[in-house]
Amino acid sequence: MELSEMTKDERSLLLFLETQAVDYGGLVDVRRMNEGDCNIASDWNECGFIIYERISFYSIEAVSTPSRRPTHYVILSQEAFRLAHEERIARAVRMFQKRTWKKPGEEDE
């Protein structure tokens, strides 16, 4: 799979899942995903791009907080991590090009 073959929704979901894997130990609160995201994640799970499954029912309470109630976990494959890294760089470039602020010295341009 290549980044250019992925839809905008797929790229966005990949970054979301990468964040869950890195910052939350893989725990995913599916309330932050829409039906399309869940379908994509399931498809990726089936083809081995990621591992995306429910956590044990008894673990849900133990890992929940007032603002997060994870019910699933994700593990990214090496390919998924590679593509997420590529997309982070591409997104940073796009966002910088869309910026509404100016760097010192640009005010006169």
For each predicted feature, which ranges?
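Short amphipathic alpha-helical interface segments
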Residues: 1-39, 85-103
